[in-house]
């Protein structure tokens, strides 16, 4: 299935949509896309395990059965390794999280960090690390961590979905019940993007992709993939009746990949 939506706000000149080869309904959620757009990562709705899926052929390979592996896995810049979480429970049934590294070429899985109550991926020396801790927006740069939370540090303001721009200069985040924002590494120059930009992802340094979803508290009723630019352009990329969600982006190949409510994977191909 394939069709084309022509741009109205001119974020993209055109966008084509098609179901990924071999994609079937099931317990499946999109978890990531490689920097070169050659493969995606999928997990279950409970973030158990990771699968590598060739984006062109649909060929699938199981990488790990780790609990929690599907929650924000990190793909290396060369696409050859993945850092993923491993959730375990101690003798008191307390939840602990470790980090494993998956070598895709060797097919190996090794422990990177032992399980702990709180765990962070890096020290921010090569690139700032942004993350959520106690529902607050945090950043680590050169081993120093600080609470940014530009919209307020209080129990009423909760932050989710943080990510660093490709050039490493801006932070994208979402304030629950309010909307998506962008700020600099100091938590300043705060810019509101949109209320209906949930699960936001950077497409490039000036463009953000998110979802505008509606639910009844139990199931999704509608969801469209949206594009936003920092200078205020907005474009609906998919019809809301298709209920496409949780986009992942690869601007190098002009790709936006998303998953349907039934677990099928869809690919959007963009032209600037």
Located regions from the model:
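Bacterial N-terminal signal peptides
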Residues: 1-4
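Sequence signature of WD/YWTD-type beta-propeller architectures
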Residues: 9-272
């Amino acid at each position: 299935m394939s069709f084309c939506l022509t741009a109205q706000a001119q974020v993209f000149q055109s966008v084509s949509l098609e179901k990924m080869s071999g994609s079937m309904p099931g317990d499946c959620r999109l978890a990531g896309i490689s920097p070169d757009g050659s493969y995606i990562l999928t997990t279950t709705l409970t973030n158990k395990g990771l699968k590598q899926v060739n984006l062109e052929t649909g060929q699938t390979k199981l990488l790990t059965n780790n609990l929690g592996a599907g929650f924000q896995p990190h793909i290396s810049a060369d696409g050859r390794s993945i850092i993923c979480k491993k959730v375990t429970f101690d003798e008191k049934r307390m939840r602990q999280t470790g980090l494993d590294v998956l070598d895709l070429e060797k097919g190996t899985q090794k422990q990177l960090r032992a399980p702990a109550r709180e765990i962070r991926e890096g020290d921010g020396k090569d690139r700032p690390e942004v993350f959520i801790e106690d529902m607050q927006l945090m950043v680590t740069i050169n081993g120093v961590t600080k609470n940014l939370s530009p919209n307020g540090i209080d129990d009423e303001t909760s932050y989710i979905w943080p990510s660093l721009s490709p050039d490493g200069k801006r932070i994208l985040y979402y304030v629950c019940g309010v909307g998506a924002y962008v700020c600099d590494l100091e938590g300043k120059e705060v810019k509101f993007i949109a209320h209906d930009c949930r699960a936001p992802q950077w497409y490039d340094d000036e463009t953000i992709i998110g979802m505008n979803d509606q639910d009844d508290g139990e199931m999704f009723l509608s969801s469209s993939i949206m594009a936003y630019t920092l200078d205020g352009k907005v474009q609906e990329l998919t019809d809301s009746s298709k209920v496409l969600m949780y986009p992942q982006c690869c601007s190098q190949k002009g790709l936006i990949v998303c998953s349907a409510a039934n677990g099928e994977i869809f690919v959007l191909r963009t032209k600037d």
